[in-house]
UniProtKB/Swiss-Prot annotation:
ATP binds at residues 52-59. The lineage of its organism: Viruses, Duplodnaviria, Heunggongvirae, Peploviricota, Herviviricetes. This is Replication origin-binding protein. Keywords: ATP-binding, DNA replication, DNA-binding, Nucleotide-binding. SMART domains: AAA, DEXDc. One of its GO terms (molecular function) is ATP binding. GO terms for biological process: DNA replication. SUPFAM superfamilies: P-loop containing nucleoside triphosphate hydrolases (SSF52540). InterPro entries: AAA+_ATPase (IPR003593), Helicase_ATP-bd (IPR014001), P-loop_NTPase (IPR027417), Replication_origin-bd (IPR003450). Probably involved in DNA replication. Binds the origin of replication (ori). Residues 39-195 form the Helicase ATP-binding domain. It comes from Human herpesvirus 6A (strain Uganda-1102) (HHV-6 variant A). Belongs to the herpesviridae OriBP family.
Length: 780
């Protein structure tokens, strides 16, 4: 029973499908609505929790309810997104609810208006409690507590709980509302009656749809792009969702090259936030990413088909976000959705473990037991987050769901299973190469294998260097003049504050030998979030290495990094925050990561965690993994949402099943402790510092590349090896002799880190001193 529970109900438990067979607390009354849209008629309980699919009339029922609320009662609606809040206000206004105000239209810092629509991140601005509280898309609201944009987590959490406690009427709605939400309300307000409305009605505009999963992108009649081309040749209007900007740009270029006369609209984060979709009817193809999500709905009967390109990638949108974005087009004429998953970026033989398997009828008991063990291990590591001081009750209560969402991104089988479950729950039929869902395991595994074998890389666009001058060129040029606050050289402008900003950054964070021009190059790289994350981890690890107390590190981190502003360009018209990094971590997780990184650095005898010059012996790697594997696997899950089990769990049968679920080649050899140790350390360095741990041969001189050996170096080495160098006069002759002699001597395998050694530039922080004055002198 434990195996079945773990395998069959992990997703249903956390994404709402299990509400039909749960025993709820005594103050919860369950209402079932199956044949009609959501309705609050005859539901008298003051707290109403609604689980209903997209297109089931939740918003319509809400508007009807609000029209009956006495005017003297105050009403607050909390949304998960600013665009969603604006769309709700628009719908309210169209339906006669004209006394609501949008929080971003209120100029006063403190909000005490009687009827307000507010986005969750701005909840701390509210000064009053409200009689009626509306939580539309409550799971998305809770999800925002994990967003990097949630800068006042504690204040928002406290206000959120206060609003629930003091409101006389609460309505919370979501398509994936879970029993944990019900239990939270029941425990938080035990003396209040609660109605759980389970509405299973789905309008025909969703229930008649079929989602066709394509196993290839190119290459055959029913491939993803072949179907798209066929639709366009018939002059069909298409909507295409892409999970990443890279995929969206790729599809945009591909469609434009094949169909140059078609009008194609591209909507990604590079074009800015999408606040309106009314203009879509002017285009033949609309390509959008998750910038179009909850709250924006395209209602006209215009698009014939919906295409979905999912590029699975660490840090990309999870399957719930994908599912929500798919539902933005409310009416599809041909009632078909074509979905392609590209797993090329998560293809790996590292021992990543899935956490669930689809409910195929023919899984063996052994296979179910393997996944059950993985699921139990996953839950155990996630529960380790208890030790951290979460500043949010909501984050603590719902962290499992967030870990599931983020962990499944790097698992092909988990992502496919979860997306299919969400589609089926919304009464959208699933077709995987002619098979419904769920299906026989061999069909499922075969589909995964073809996906992996036929997947393709998307080449990133390379931006060729233009005519723009570098910081150093502008400052050094004799033709540069001072024009007001700007240094000017032809069309090139550089604000004087940029020099000051670079000087301050250099003095605060960088080593004495780093000049202001290198500092400018580093700041340019830090515009990339992944580079910022590495910088933060390096800085923290160096603090630990210098023996700084964790409380002092936290203080300086908050003062110098978390809110440190850097210019996006020479013009200093826009700034970004150095501490603007995504993740599910708390401060305690970051500092634990830094302490673990320092212990690993010492074990491997590295100068830093980005040291590219030191050879790492295999013995040191194995000893480090033996000492630190438990801590590494815990941090990998809690900080990086990467699920790896302990070595003892990886039997040959386990590896074979995991590789099948990844669509990879079946393993025939033994998975040794050496391979496991190298794998987990490779994952750690890649996730924490973007460094690649690779096998190599020992360097001739530690810390010195072969190509940099001098004639004297080579002569000394040959003498030490007792190799005659008679008649060896030139460097070429010495190098050849050294190479031949080393073949018999260099049999040992060593490892080294490859990547950018940013640690060389980051300052030692033992006393948190500054190495230079904030500015530089620039002659005119």
């Amino acid at each position: 029973m434990e195996n079945r529970f773990q395998n069959d109900t992990l997703f249903s438990e956390w994404f709402g499908q299990s509400l039909s067979d749960v025993r709820f607390p005594d103050n919860v009354t369950v209402y079932s609505q199956a044949d009609s849209a959501v309705s609050f008629e005859n539901v008298r309980q003051p707290i109403k929790l609604v689980r209903a699919a997209m297109g089931s009339g939740k918003t319509t029922a809400l508007i009807h309810f609000l029209k009956q609320v006495p005017r003297e009662l105050s009403v607050l609606l909390i949304s998960c997104r600013k665009t969603f809040a604006a769309e709700i206000l628009h719908r309210f206004t169209l339906n006669g609810l004209k006394d609501f105000e949008l929080y971003c239209d209120i100029t006063e810092r403190q909000i005490n208006n009687r009827k307000v629509i507010v986005q969750i991140e701005s909840l701390h601005r509210l000064t009053e409690n409200y009689d009626v509280l509306i939580l539309d898309e409550i799971m998305s609201i809770i999800k925002q507590f994990y967003s990097k944009t949630m800068t006042k987590t504690k204040e928002v959490d406290c206000k959120f709980l206060s609003l629930i406690k003091n409101s006389s009427h609460v309505i919370a709605m979501d398509a994936t509302l879970t029993r944990h939400v019900v239990e939270f309300f029941a425990a938080f307000k035990p003396d209040t009656q609660i109605a759980l409305i389970r509405n299973t009605f789905v309008s025909a505009m969703f229930s008649n749809r079929i989602a066709y999963f394509c196993d290839t992108f190119f290459g055959k009649e029913f491939s993803f792009f072949a179907r798209l081309e066929d639709k366009l040749r018939w002059d069909k209007k298409l909507c295409l969702f892409c999970s990443t900007v890279l995929a969206a740009e790729y599809m945009y270029d591909l469609i434009r090259s094949r169909f140059p006369l078609k009008k194609v609209l591209l909507l990604t984060s590079k074009q800015g936030k999408c606040s309106s979709i009314e203009s879509w009817i002017r285009y033949d193809v609309v390509i959008y990413t998750s910038v179009v999500t909850v709250g924006l709905s395209f209602e006209p009967v215009y698009f014939s088909s919906l295409f979905v390109y999912i590029q699975l990638a660490k840090g990309g949108p999870d399957m719930v976000s994908v599912f929500q974005s798919i539902g933005r087009v409310r009416r599809v004429i041909d009632e078909d959705i074509y979905i392609y998953m590209n797993p090329v970026l998560i293809r790996s033989y590292d021992p990543l473990a899935p956490i669930a398997i689809p409910p195929c009828s023919d899984w063996s008991v052994a296979e179910q037991s393997i996944i059950s063990e993985s699921c139990i291990d996953f839950r155990g590591k996630c529960s380790g987050a208890h030790k951290y001081n979460f500043c949010s009750v909501l984050k603590s209560l719902f962290r499992y769901r967030h870990y599931i969402e983020k962990t499944t991104i790097t698992s092909l089988s988990d992502s496919l299973f979860l997306l299919c479950s969400l589609l089926c729950e919304n009464s959208i039929k699933v077709d995987i190469v002619g098979n419904g869902f769920p299906m026989r395991k061999e069909v499922f595994l075969s589909f995964l294998q073809i996906l992996v074998e036929e997947c393709h890389f998307i080449e990133k666009k390379i931006t060729l260097p233009g005519d723009d001058m570098t910081f150093q060129e502008i400052i050094s040029s004799r033709e540069t003049i001072m024009n007001g606050d700007f240094y000017e050289n032809g069309d090139q402008l550089l604000h004087k504050d940029y020099i000051t900003d670079m000087g301050k950054f250099r003095a605060t964070f960088l080593s004495p030998g780093v000049d202001i021009f290198i500092a400018s190059d580093i700041v340019y790289d830090l515009k990339n979030e992944s580079k910022r994350y590495v910088f933060v981890n390096v800085w923290l690890q160096k603090c630990v290495s210098a023996g700084v107390e964790s409380t002092e590190i936290e203080r300086v981190f908050c003062e110098r990094i978390k809110c440190y502003m850097l210019p996006k360009s020479f013009l200093c018209d826009e700034y970004f925050v150095l501490g603007d990094i995504s993740g599910v971590y708390e401060w305690g997780m970051l500092i634990d990561l830094a302490f673990l990184a320092e212990m690993i650095r010492k074990d491997l005898k590295l100068k830093s965690c980005t040291d590219t010059t030191t050879d790492i012996s295999e013995d040191d790697l194995l000893l480090c993994a033996a000492r630190r594997s438990s801590d590494i696997l815990q941090i990998m899950q809690l900080v990086f949402t990467v699920h790896v089990q302990f070595f003892q769990k990886y039997s040959l049968q386990t590896l074979q099943l995991f590789n099948k679920l990844r669509g990879m080649r079946i393993v025939t050899g033994v998975f040794s402790i050496e391979k496991f140790s190298i794998s987990i350390l490779r994952l750690f360095f890649k996730c924490a510092f973007n460094m690649t741990l690779s096998a190599s041969r020992p360097r001739y001189i530690p810390g010195k590349a072969y190509r940099n050996l001098t004639k004297n170096d080579m002569e000394n080495m040959l003498d030490n090896w007792e190799i005659s160098r008679t008649n060896l006069k030139t460097c070429k002759e010495l190098r050849k002799a050294l190479t031949e002699a080393s073949r018999a001597r260099r049999k040992q395998t060593i490892y080294k880190l490859q990547g950018s050694d940013i640690s060389l530039s980051v300052s030692e922080v033992g006393v948190f001193g500054q190495h230079a004055s904030p500015g530089v002198c620039v002659s005119s």
